[in-house]
Amino acid sequence: YGQIVGSIIENGRADRFIVRLCELIKHLAVDKLHIVGDLFDRGPRPDIILDLLMRHHNVDIQWGNHDVVWMGAAAGSPICICTVLKTTLAYHNHGMLEDCYGINLRHLQRMAEQFYGNDDLSIWMPHTDAARGPYTRGMLHRCAVMHKAISILMFKLECHVIDRNPDFQMQAVSYTHLTL
């Protein structure tokens, strides 16, 4: 084995060999990777995480509630779409929708500015991550106004679902206390 190691070093392949050896050990050490959701929610790049997981030889995913909402949004459910948008806006993560998935939020932004641009948006301000900042006042305002608009749309959709499904026993849920 000494000659093999020596020839790897002589040929300038030692770094690559060590990396591949580590990958092999990691592959053999983890027989099955069991992921307990949520993959989708507040992180900046769930698409990269999924790509990495798909490369693993044996992965099992137990989808979480946030993952299921994203699947519902991808399937076209209006209430799931609003929920995903509301969550990404609440955590100032909506850039991921535009950059990773090509979802244009310009129409939402224009509508939100038209109806709510001059409102007090203090309760709609996003949670921010200093590591991903800095955030300008304009950035936070745009996010907050869209957050308010999509939340109102989501609340209206939720009311329709509750009205259509009395067996949910959620008639007591009301958004009339909110100042929208």
Q: Can you say where each PLM-predicted feature lies in the sequence?
A:
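Extended charged low-complexity segments that act as oligomerization/scaffolding linkers
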Residues: 73-124
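A short alpha/beta connector and helix-capping loop motif
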Residues: 48-61
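Conserved small/polar residues in nucleotide/adenosyl-binding loops
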Residues: 176-179
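Short gly/pro/ser/thr-enriched loop/turn and capping motifs at secondary-structure boundaries
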Residues: 67-70
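Low-complexity, highly charged intrinsically disordered N-terminal segments
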Residues: 1-22
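Metal-dependent catalytic neighborhoods of phosphoester/phosphodiester hydrolases
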Residues: 44-51, 72-78
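Residue-level marker for buried hydrophobic side chains located in beta-strands
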Residues: 33-35, 61-62
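Divalent metal-coordination and catalytic microenvironments
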Residues: 38, 65
